[in-house]
């Protein structure tokens, strides 16, 4: 079966990837975070991102990758650089659960942000599964556009919440870096 032979690429918080290999399935685990899955069906490529917070005005460097506004731009530009056309892009959006009852509903804010961002960019959302109170495991085949989600149990959701609330470490400097002062 094709699924068993698929090359799995896991997308963690603050990442995005673009691929054109039909054997690749992208995966991620979401609580209040959101993943946008975009593809160009004619160019035969697609990608996924995974963001923690909706948007912000002036964050740069390593912190910027936590924000949807930054990761949405990176994903779209990554697709365009590899030959996608903006007018052919289509999207699927997942995540945005309310995983902690006492916190503000950042998951809902994430989902609203993603949907509005895509609308503003003229990219149709052909499918979405957002909200609720449980996390999700997402599988996305970027070339075919097929997507599948698996709901997480309460314990799995709480483990995901713990990972989402932990700060993402900044990238480590490369050993051969040269510092000018």
Curated annotation (Swiss-Prot):
GO terms for molecular function: protein-glutamine glutaminase activity. The keyword Isomerase does not apply. Pfam families: CheD. SUPFAM superfamilies: CNF1/YfiH-like putative cysteine hydrolases. Keywords: Chemotaxis, Hydrolase. InterPro entries: CheD-like_sf, Chemorcpt_Glu_NH3ase_CheD, Cytotoxic_necrot_fac-like_cat. It catalyses: L-glutaminyl-[protein] + H2O = L-glutamyl-[protein] + NH4(+). Its EC number is 3.5.1.44. GO terms for biological process: chemotaxis. HAMAP family: CheD (MF_01440). Belongs to the CheD family. Probably deamidates glutamine residues to glutamate on methyl-accepting chemotaxis receptors (MCPs), playing an important role in chemotaxis. This is Probable chemoreceptor glutamine deamidase CheD. The lineage of its organism: Bacteria, Pseudomonadati, Pseudomonadota, Alphaproteobacteria, Hyphomicrobiales.
